[in-house]
Amino acid sequence: MTSFGTLYTYMPNARVFKILAAAKLNNLIIEIPAYQHGVTNKSAEFLSKFPAGKVPAFEGPDGFCLVESDAIAQYVAQSGPQASQLLGQDAMSSAKIRQWISFFAEEIYPTVLDLVMWRVGLGAFDETTEIKALAQLAYGLSVLEKHLNPGILLTGDELTLADLTGASTLLWAFMHIIDEPMRQQYPNVVAWYLKVVQNEEVKEVFGKPNLIEKRRIGAK
């Protein structure tokens, strides 16, 4: 099967899973070449295609170049037979899907980064940031908990780009932050997350759920 394009990124990159999952549903092959952050994305060849030097970055076989993970995910979702499922069949369903994609990007992902970076050695613990970020994450999860009913997805009965984006956004959170006591507070969110990442069509992308018993606590 012909490659749909090349995705430049370090791995694991939480912003990439939604792209790869959308490709999987659309039966599209995306290649991920060897990549060294701070080297590959600073090369003259890379910058000639992607001036911002950011990843993920997508290049099609025709030379079409695209950056920003949501834009790449949208393009991949729209480029295959499951486009209407992933992006909606009409203006209202498409808007609902876009609503949740925006919610994850604006309300949850920055908070997850604040909480995860020091836990993986990419920053120092800051108590003020930690308290604020935990409160923001709790807010985001509470909104989701109220919206989700047991066993349902975000906007209907089938996986959409909203679900894939949400699962990608929360992947690191479940790996590092949302421990057993916290999961008990948001049973609908946990059930939805597991339903998405364990879906037969995309579970190969997300891998086995890596849920933690107790999150790491920073020293004051």
Swiss-Prot record:
One of its GO terms (biological process) is translational elongation. Transmembrane segments: none annotated. Coiled coil: none annotated. Residues 90-220 form the GST C-terminal domain. Gene3D superfamilies: 1.20.1050.10, Glutaredoxin (3.40.30.10). Keywords: Transferase. Its EC number is 2.5.1.-. GO terms for molecular function: transferase activity. It is an enzyme of class 2 (transferase). Residues 3-84 form the GST N-terminal domain. Glutathione S-transferase-like protein; part of the gene cluster that mediates the biosynthesis of the mycotoxin fusarin C. Within the cluster, FUS1, FUS2, FUS8 and FUS9 are sufficient for fusarin production. The other FUS cluster members are not essential for fusarin C biosynthesis. Belongs to the GST superfamily. This is Glutathione S-transferase-like protein FUS3.
